[in-house]
Amino acid sequence: MLMTKPPVPQLNLTAVHEAAERAARAIPPLWPLESSVAVNPFLGQIGEPLAVAAARLRRVAGAAVTMPRAWYAERIASGELSDVDLAAAIDAATPTTRPLTIAELKRAAQMEIAPPQALPTVADLASAVSGFDWTGFVAERISAWASGYFDRGQALWAAPKGPNAYAAWRLTATHDLTPEIFSITGFAADVAAAPESADAALIRAVEQLGLSEAASESYFHRLLVGLGGWAQLARYRLWQAELSGSTDTTVTDLLAVRAVWDSALLRKYQPQIAAEWTDAINGYAQPLQPTEDDQINAILQDAVERAAQRKLQTVLTASSQPKPEDRPALQMAFCIDVRSEPFRRALESLDPRIRTLGFGGFFGLPIAHRRFASDVVEARLPVLLPPRVTTSCSGHTHAHEANDRAKRVAARAKRAWGRFKLAAISSFAFVESMGPVYVAKLLSDGLRPGTRTTNTDPVPQFDPPLALGARVDTAEAVLRAMSLTGPFAPLVLIAGHGASVVNNPHASALHCGACGGFPGDVNARLLAGLLNDPEVRTALAGRDIAIPADTLFVGALHDTTTDAVTLYDADHHSPAHAAALAQTRDWLATAGALTRSERALRLPRAATGGAIARRARDWAEVRPEWALAGCRAFIAAPRSHTSGRDLQGQAFLHDYDWRKDTDFSVLELILTAPVVVASWISLQYYGSTVAPETFGAGNKLLHNVTGGIGVVEGNGGLLRSGLPWQSVHDGERLVHQPLRLSVLIEAPHEAISTILDRYPEVRALFDNGWMHLLALDDNGRMHWRYGGDGGWERADNPPANQRVASFE
């Protein structure tokens, strides 16, 4: 039977291609496991407010963007969410859609609403009329091909690549008889007859499906969301290409592949689903319009976040012991990561002469690094930036060269052994014969107290070396950005951070996000070396940064899983600092013990801090640490505003003194780099909590690595992105409360506005409510609140129209 389709006007090919490009950019990127970093799952929706994003993601993903109503009702009933918070959220909402009274909002919170439903694809409709899961079948066939195409060396037989993803899929699909076996007659022949380019194939599929131009973008977005992590991995390729000034077509190639499948299924089931498919096309073509429930959910979410800000204000205004003004005995710079906050608080409590500060964990060094005995280049910087400097740990001595050769031989042997274990002809025999050998290692790792294997690479160095002028400029820029221009302690530690876990495919996600998913030790050691350089210090003195001759900078690594700190003092041998280093090691050990005891209260089955190290080496432990769960605030201000306050490991802390930032260049850096990185982290946790099926990685217990790039649940299926459920839930309750990030900055709000005007993509995050922005006064109190569209309102003295009485 010939397939008939609804009549549509002549397609505007340019419009269809533009719709495909917009749909591709609505998908967030997914970094491979080796350098996994947190990504904002709403990256493609930052140009629209939460309620509009809710309407869009309901249409294309069937996903919620807020919690169930009962979650808000519980907080109202407990008093955590007060009438003041509800009133303020109502007042901030769009006047034409907000409920009139607090009472109405409370009643709405008591009413559960239907879960969101996505518009159907042809595969969905075919599944409904046939009783066969065509949606799952299509996902399985695409995943089977994609896991080979994107493979990074895990597969023993390489899949055909072709010049691009679409061409590679055609090579496979024209020989794959699985669709024929499952009754899609002529599928392979149809693929063979399809156009050779993805663009032409997509146009052909659009014509066969009878899509209108108005429906194309939403339909394309729907198909890409249905591909899960595969579409996001393709989006990563586009992201990386654009960082280097080129482009990549893998996302639209996958879109064409998925559209061909729908076209084939429509040919088979058109008589049964014609009317439903026409309705679906009309639904895709409708303008986005948030419902009343979308608006109410957005108001309730805003109210919960205002309640959290009110609680944070109470903590920040609590009194604390002032620090003495004399020269500190120890200064220690940490990454702004929320996991450093409890350690910093514990360390400072040991001696009033200890100062800590926070800065982005790549420490201002945008490096592409090659480790010792390796040719792999690691981008150890925020994924928002391209590397600008190359570094290595190659070393030049005879001993280093011999060690390099030995490590390379060992690495090759390890790879060969791994391939032997996985080979089709040897894998079963391997398990039978060699399995008992691994019992000793399992017992050793499970029972022996955990000790982290530290990085023993030679001292990292700029390769090629930087000229003196570049070294001085870099050192000055970093010190001023850290607000570290004096006085300097005799010992200054630059501490990156990493994690020590075993049997965890997402291990890189526990490392430093500002270092691209790698530990921060290399950046810390490089900066320490730069600041110990006598020529650099001499030049810095001429720029009003005088570093005393007795000040030693030492790189360090904070293990966030065990709270042990490794010092790389051997990089800069200094007998004069032996006593200071010994005292510092004692302080660090004590601070680590205090921090572990605090963290043990939150970790399941970790009654004491002593259990932390054991958990780090437990192959069966799914929660070795909580990582950044609980993150809710970013504070850029002098440390005096947060020192001594218990922020419960929930705040990113960036030292910043606007009085030293005469041209506000440091403020610009903060708003455009660490704030954006923190938003990605915060919103990944948010998305993985409110919609774990769509934005989360599923059950960690079922994860299998595929292609060396990502995880699937079980033995196949779609690539999963986001956080595993165990990263936000302890088995009984949520440990991460889904709150959009509150950004608190001590700086004139006019200066903040000026910078936002120069960066529309950053401003969009605040204009559309994906983050809150508050300006602090000189005492650390929330003084101004950003209201969107460049406007500010007083945060400490609500206007009359925010009074609770006006809504009752």
Curated annotation (Swiss-Prot):
Binding residue positions for Zn(2+): 335, 337, 497, 512
Molecular functions per Gene Ontology: zinc ion binding
PANTHER family documented for this protein: INORGANIC CARBON TRANSPORTER SUBUNIT DABA-RELATED, UPF0753 PROTEIN AQ_863
Quaternary context: Forms a complex with DabB.
Keywords associated with the record: Cell inner membrane, Cell membrane, Membrane, Metal-binding, Transport, Zinc
Membrane topology, from the record: Peripheral membrane protein
Cofactor(s) for this UniProt protein: Zn(2+)
Function: Part of an energy-coupled inorganic carbon pump.
Record's GO cellular component terms: plasma membrane
Keyword Zinc-finger recorded: no
Compartment(s) where it occurs, according to its Swiss-Prot or TrEMBL record: Cell inner membrane
Protein's organism: Rhodopseudomonas palustris (strain TIE-1)
Cell membrane among keywords: yes
Protein name: Probable inorganic carbon transporter subunit DabA
Underlying gene: dabA
